[in-house]
Structure formats: structure tokens, C-alpha cells
Design a protein with these regions (language model features):
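Enzymes that bind and transform nitrogen-containing heteroaromatic metabolites
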Residues: 1-238
Length: 238
């Protein structure tokens, strides 16, 4: 595991059968007002939020802090009213007319050299960051090292499942917040919190339940991720 990187928390809402969207991948607006306030509180506690291009395309906007008490708390510690909002996309094929580009947030783009060329003459993003592997993919390890170097110490990942899987595979996630919402979506193609190929059960990331609460019809689960280094240490002890 990288020694210096942001403390990273995944924050997602899902149906009771573990889907973060329906089979049409429509915007997941099934969370209650309580879930919205929970998400806003978590966002207020971080320096940056990261989300994939498909998540942005689905919503057209990003979640901003609007609660006055949360804004005041950030101001007291000399933070910007809003965390940096970072889109990660290989192609950077984004509609410049979506509402996201009018929202009062600092926007960064994480992409490839090809994706950067799409936006190099636009003012849509405050920063365009290119970290590429020799295979032309986005270098996630280089990304988290860079974020730490610019004093982003706490990072929230807001989806989608492909992005969450990429970070889990590299053992870069520390906490997971899941809101279980009272509906069943079903569907073989409906996305889950963790996408890509998946993990064999013997190699699956382990979790430790930190807290659980029920608010009206929703259950809020807070997990800590057990890192591979912790598992290795335990195996050496026993």
C-alpha cells in the first residue's frame, strides 16, 4: 500500500438487492432526504470528491454542500466552501452544456493525453491532470500520489462501480458508507457498488462494521476496509 495517499471513503446508496441504479442506468434518485443530508455531511468532511464520467452523464450535476452549518464549519477551518470535484474519464467525452459546468465548484479532470486534448482550449476545468500507464490507461497509483502532494488528505468516491472496483483492486479504499434504500431494482445488467470482473471469495476485500443506524426506512452502514497489509500482519502473528 502507498505510504502517502488520501484517506479514501466510498459513499453510495443502493437498493435492498444491492443495485446502485436500474437496468437503464437511470440517475439513482431513490434515496430519501435523510440520505441526501448524510451524503452532504460526508462531502463536507473531505478535500475532494471523485466520480466517473458515466456517473456525471447520468445526473448532469454534482452534489454540492448547501446546508449553512456545514458551510460554516468548512469556513472555520479555512476550507473552500466546496471540495474539489474531480471527474475521471479515459476519453473525457463530456457534454460542455450540462449543468455541472455552471455549478459553483472547482472542477478538475483526470484523463489521458487523448482526453486532455478535448478540453485544452476550454475553461470548463480548473485543472486537467494526465497520469498515464504505458498501456495508455489512467494511472490510479500516480493519481493518488499526486492528490496527496497537493494536500488532498481526504477523498470521497461517489461512483460508479467501475471506479470503486479500480480503487479496491489496488487496496486504496479505507472506508465505505452504504445506504440501503427500501426498494428492489433487480436486473442482470443493473450496476452494483463494485463493478469490473469482481473478486473470488478467498481474495475478496474484507470489511469491519464500524457503525450501523436506521433512519425511517433506510439503513446506513459504515464499514472500514481491512487492508492487505493488516491481513499479512495478522497471518504472521498467528
Amino acid at each position: 500500500m502507498i505510504e502517502k495517499r488520501p484517506h479514501t471513503t466510498v459513499i453510495l446508496a443502493m437498493s435492498a438487492d444491492g443495485k446502485i441504479a436500474d437496468f437503464n442506468r437511470s440517475p439513482a434518485r431513490f434515496g430519501s432526504l435523510n440520505d441526501k443530508l448524510h451524503l452532504e455531511k460526508q462531502i463536507a468532511a473531505v478535500d475532494a470528491v471523485l466520480f466517473g464520467a458515466d456517473t456525471l452523464r447520468a445526473y448532469g450535476t454534482t452534489m454540492i454542500i448547501s446546508e449553512s452549518i456545514l458551510l460554516q464549519q468548512r469556513t472555520k477551518v479555512n476550507n473552500h466552501p466546496q471540495p474539489v470535484h474531480i471527474v475521471i474519464s479515459h476519453s473525457a467525452n463530456l457534454n460542455p452544456d450540462i449543468k455541472f459546468f455552471q455549478q459553483p465548484v472547482r472542477r478538475w479532470l483526470l484523463t489521458t493525453s487523448g482526453g486532455a486534448s478535448v478540453w485544452e482550449k476550454s475553461s470548463g476545468f480548473e485543472q486537467i491532470l494526465v497520469f498515464e500507464t504505458p498501456q495508455g490507461e489512467i494511472d490510479i497509483l500516480a493519481v493518488v500520489k499526486y492528490l496527496a502532494s497537493v494536500e488532498i488528505s481526504r477523498l470521497a468516491i461517489l461512483g460508479g462501480g467501475q471506479l470503486v472496483a479500480s480503487f479496491l483492486e489496488l487496496d486504496l479504499i479505507d472506508e465505505i458508507w452504504l445506504t440501503i434504500c427500501p426498494l428492489i431494482l433487480g436486473g442482470n445488467t443493473a450496476p452494483s457498488p463494485v463493478g469490473r470482473k469482481g473478486f473470488l471469495s478467498a481474495l475478496a476485500p474484507g470489511l469491519q462494521l464500524l457503525e450501523v443506524s436506521t433512519v425511517e426506512q433506510e439503513v446506513f452502514l459504515h464499514y472500514g476496509v481491512i487492508h492487505k497489509s493488516e491481513l499479512n500482519l495478522k497471518s504472521q502473528i498467528f
